[in-house]
Amino acid sequence: MSTKKDKFSNKDKIFMELALNLAKARHGLTGINPSVGCVIVKNNEILSIGQTGFKGTPHAEFNAIKNSNENLEGSKMYVTLEPCSHYGKTPPCTNIIIKNKIKEVVYGVEDIDKKVKGKTLKILQSKNILVKKNLLKKEINKFYTPYFFNRKNNLPFVTGKIAISRNN
């Protein structure tokens, strides 16, 4: 079960930082989908990593599971954004997490997309998977500012810069 005050170890933070760096490496290359990073760990050893594919598919969770040559049963997944729980261009990430018997999922922030928001927690907990959230919340929220703006306002997030020369 997850609470608002989940406790995280230094190793948890290190694994989530790696997931965030994976997400940052694909920033701007995932089409309309957010860039997500995923790290799968067992006994504090990294079994696999994944990130959102170019143009948004496959999702990071799917790629991390696909990239592994190990049995993932009993492992722990760190993912920057709440895993999806709906059918779209891809099946729900919650399905592949359950199928691979991952015992714990830690995600950085809740997805504000109405199709996902808060649903993952209930689905995974109903399968006795421990779920924790809000690890590195401040840093990850900052990274997803453009994505959240787009989902809230249905507009692109635009950054403009103006420069002027001193010798005019």
Q: Where do the model's predicted regions map?
A:
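Zinc-dependent deaminase
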Residues: 1-30, 43-46, 57, 87-167
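Acidic, glycine-enriched active-site microenvironments
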Residues: 15, 31-39, 73-75
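Anionic group-transfer/hydrolysis microenvironments
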Residues: 37-39, 50, 82, 163, ...
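N-terminal beta-alpha supersecondary unit
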Residues: 38, 42, 46-67, 136
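Residues that line or immediately flank small-molecule/substrate-binding pockets and catalytic motifs
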Residues: 54, 81, 109
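Short HxH-centered metal-ligating active-site micro-motif
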Residues: 62-98
